[in-house]
Every structure is written in structure tokens, then in C-alpha cells.
Amino acid sequence: MTIYHFVGIKGSGMSALAQILHDKGFQVQGSDVDKYFFTQKALEEKQIPIMTFSADNIKEGLTIIAGNAFPDTHEEIERANELNLPVIRYHKFLGQLIDGYTSIAITGSHGKTSTTGLLSHVVGAIRPTSYLIGDGTGSGTKDAKYFALEACEYQRHFLAYKPTYAIMTNIDWDHPDYFKSVDDVFNAFETLGKQVKKAVFALGDDVELRKLSLDVPIIYFGFGSENEFQAKNVKKETTGTKFDVYHRDEFLASFEIPAYGDHNVLNALSVIALCDYEGLPVDEVKKELKTFEGVKRRFSITEKGNQVLVDDYAHHPSEIRATVNAARQKYPNKKIVAVFQPHTFTRTRTFLQGFADSLNLADEVYLCDIFGSAREKTGNLTIADLAHKTKGNHIIKEEHTEELLQYPEAVILFMGAGDVQKFQAAYEKVLDNEIVANEVLKKSAIN
């Protein structure tokens, strides 16, 4: 039996796919840079070997699954080609894997990971379901009928998939290093839609998604009355959100989610619509929606002392706006402080004013240096260009996060798609030291 070797196994999709193959009984190993990523925890728990990149890792008998961040000139891929080993790109392998399942591809400019996680949680509790989530979580469930997968639009990789269903959460212009306009993004989504076998569930409040012309039914969901599935009577509370769902103007049921913001209502509505279409019991769907704890790096909350720290993947103006609004719903009486690390120079330059406008919805703004991607290490833009447009013109360094101590009782949002977590980790150490120091002072005062 072949051993599957993942080049770039710590990538979020790659880590999830490796876990799926492992669960299905295959031998799996992989390699990556010698740096800790949150995605490797699950790999280590399943005892999947992780090596540091080296051509010496590549031997006879391996099948290579190559991450899309790595070119054909990568040392391991070159060695594999020299040995005439099979080399398959991640998205192409996944496209082959989902055949034979009732597959559900979740895509959209924003909300893919959260919606895939929610769908996997709900459907997986009702019927056997395998899933691949973009937070590095994957499961190859035995006897699975369904396969839920996050489908990334970047470089049109999702066109390797021919799913049974697709959920399209929205269309927005992102990845400006590849997509030239929102029309370019739309064309990619419509092409995917034409490969779907059974039905597409699309946000009907989205102007771009309303333009879709497909051969399969399009089931629209949203807040507007023109949608087949409509969310009404939304009640936003500090413990979550309640709403009613109407199907073709007929009351379906009332639902409750432990999540915040309109975007999470819409994510849930897409899952409700698909479950209804598949005939899954509405009472079970209601029950599972109430217990979803979220996915990694999506409004992940840590309470330290009197402050609330939130880790979130938001890296586009629309996502930052949604995260700030969600924080205001859950913590209406607290100050909101945004700590943001822009991801890629191209995206930062393209959406500079949009970033400023979204960040300024927070009460205070702190900016980290721009995180260059593997494809783009430098640019002729600096973080100062964005700082000049935001409240306070604050730039924060990893070694000086103590500046955030001046906001007691605040919610600190650490946002970005790079390694903004290291800023939160540094600040948590500062907070721990502060808490210990305060305890010492209290004891001294008592004595």
C-alpha cells in the first residue's frame, strides 16, 4: 500500500486532508517548515509523522500530495519527479476523493470556514459525514454518506470539484493578486455552479449571486422577502441570536444559535436550507445549531483578568466589519480595541481605505506590520500608510503589547490571516505577569 506524503502538511486544507486519509485507514506522513502552526496539533494527536522539508524525505513507494503554496521547483517535488512518483496537487486529489459521496462544497469570498464547520456539525450529528474544514480540521467518517468540504476560490482551485451541492455565501472582490475585478470573481463562481450536479444554495441578498445562470436549481436564502428561505424576526442577544425561518412564505421553525452578527444568521440559514432540501428532520437541525461551538480562529474568545481577547481570521474589510459588529452585540457595554495585522501587500494596497473605514468602527485601533504571503514577501507599502488613516495612528510591536493594558474591561480583537496570534500570545504573557503582580500587591496590603 502506498504512503501518502504531504508537501506542506501544516497548511489548513492539507492538514485536514491528511487527517481524513488517516481516518480512512491510509498511511500518511508529511513535511513542512520547522515552525509551529496551530494546524499541527490535530496531526500530532493522530500521530501523523511531520518532517522538516528535505529531498531526503522522498523515497520509492510514496504518493505525493503537493500543497498549492509550493512550486514544482520545490526540492521535494523535484525529487519525486526524478523518481517518477505520482505527484497530485491538493485540490485535484480532493476533487477525486469526493466522488461517490453526496458532496457539499461550501464557497464564498467570506464565511467559508464557519459555514463548513457549522454544516459538518449539524449534518454530521444526524447522518455519517466526512468533512474538510479550512481551520485545519478533517474527519474521514466510516460509512459516511455526506462529504462537506471548504472550496477555495483562489486561483480557481475549486474548479477541480464537481460536487452534488454547493453553498455560496457571497461574492466580493478579494485576492487582488489573482482576481482582477468582482466580475472576474463572479465568472469563477458561475463556472463552479455549472459543475454542480443537483442544486446551488446562494445568498439571495447578494447582488452578484443574483446574476447566476445555471443548469441546476438555485435556492436563494437571505433576509429579503424574495428569498425562498427567509430569516425574519431576528433577536440579537448577548448570549446569541434567535430568528424565525420561512420557506416560500410559510413558517418553517424558530432557531437559536450561540453566535453573533448577521453573517452568522446567514451561515445558519444556508445550512437550514440544505438540510430541508435533503429531508433532514428540522427538530434535529434546531438542536444541533444550538450546540455549535465554532471553528478555530473565528471569534475565538479567551478571558484574561477583566479583558476579553478575541482571535479572528478577519483579513478583508467586510470581515473586519462583521467581527467588530459581532463584538458589539456580545459585549454592548465594553470598549472595542482592534489589533490588526494586514495580510499581503497587494490586498492592503487595493483595499487601503476600506480597511481604514472598517477598523475605525472599533473604539481604538492598533496595527501590526504587514504579513507577506509565501508568494509575496515585500511591497512598496508600509503599515504607516494604513496607520495614518486609522484612529490614533497606533503601530504595535510584538515586544511592546503592554500598551493594551491601558484598556481595562475592554474587548481586544486580534485579527488577521498571518501570524497575529503571536501578538496575542505575547500580550497574554504580559497579562499573566500583571495578574501575578496584582496578587502579590494584594497579599502585601493584607499583611
Swiss-Prot record:
Pfam families: Mur_ligase, Mur_ligase_C, Mur_ligase_M. GO terms for biological process: cell division; cell wall organization; peptidoglycan biosynthetic process; regulation of cell shape. Coiled coil: none annotated. It comes from the Bacteria. GO terms for molecular function: ATP binding; UDP-N-acetylmuramate-L-alanine ligase activity. It is found in: Cytoplasm. It catalyses: UDP-N-acetyl-alpha-D-muramate + L-alanine + ATP = UDP-N-acetyl-alpha-D-muramoyl-L-alanine + ADP + phosphate + H(+). Keywords: ATP-binding, Cell cycle, Cell division, Cell shape, Cell wall biogenesis/degradation, Cytoplasm, Ligase, Nucleotide-binding, Peptidoglycan synthesis. Pathway: Cell wall biogenesis; peptidoglycan biosynthesis. ATP binds at residues 108-114. Its EC number is 6.3.2.8. GO terms for cellular component: cytoplasm. Belongs to the MurCDEF family. HAMAP family: MurC (MF_00046). Cell wall formation. This is UDP-N-acetylmuramate--L-alanine ligase. It comes from Listeria innocua serovar 6a (strain ATCC BAA-680 / CLIP 11262).
